[in-house]
Amino acid sequence: DGSYILASETCALDIIGANFIREIENGEVVVITKRGLKSYHPFPKKKVRHCIFEYIYFARPDSIVGGHSVYECRKSLGRELAKESHVEADMIIPVPDSGVPSAVGYSEESGVPFELGIIRNHYVGRTFIEPQQSIRAFSVKLKHNANRALVGGKKIVLVDDSIVRGTTSVKIVQMMRDAGASEVHMRIAAPPITHPDFYGIDTPSQDQLLAATKSLQEMGDYLGADSLSFLSVDGLYRAMGHPKGRDNDCPQYTDHCFTGDYPTNLIDEDGEQDFKQLSLLTVSNTPEQ
């Protein structure tokens, strides 16, 4: 009927039966009036660098971001993860729900069966953004339960999308142990998160990020897993369709949570030198890549 609908993800358009036309470009101003739609570009053109965490976790798997199916991207992450860190096991189990597509890809690549060894309560929200540790821990208990009849006596690979503080992972590994799993291996379909985000996402300060404070061995011991592996940064880029991996001179995505390569300079608002205090952003004076 000539109406326009704007949404942050394409899945919202699917739900109401709207047709996806295109994404609004970086720096573009779209004005919609009774006379129609007009597009303006008042700012200089910049290189498009989507946040790679949209593909890993934030976007819904049934959305299209930057022309890519989020679901297929996550399956590809799992396939690349299986190539990098295969381990002998009886089954591949996703940490639901965000770990499901990557676990499917891991299973397809490794040839190890995919099973639903964890049942999720869908009425509990995301745990990593809960403000208090006690609330996060209790939320994990409410959110997940082991499929005991399936995992007892089995060697399992748990596939998750990422690890922030490790709150969920510790509880999940112990849950699998309590359910009788003989071995529990953690495989993470993203690189270690070593730097906080200062662009509106409620990630912790750096000293609360598990991968920023512990070595790989220390993280595995902390989680209680028999082994722990993360997808490499280059593996992440290969999974996203870049065979040569990350272009370090001109990165294809913003990936500062993994690399510390922030797209803008960071200024300490209160004058403190401690990195975790950095909060105020300013446009970088460095040449645009």
Label for each model-derived stretch:
Residues D1-Q289:
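PRPP-associated nucleotide enzymes
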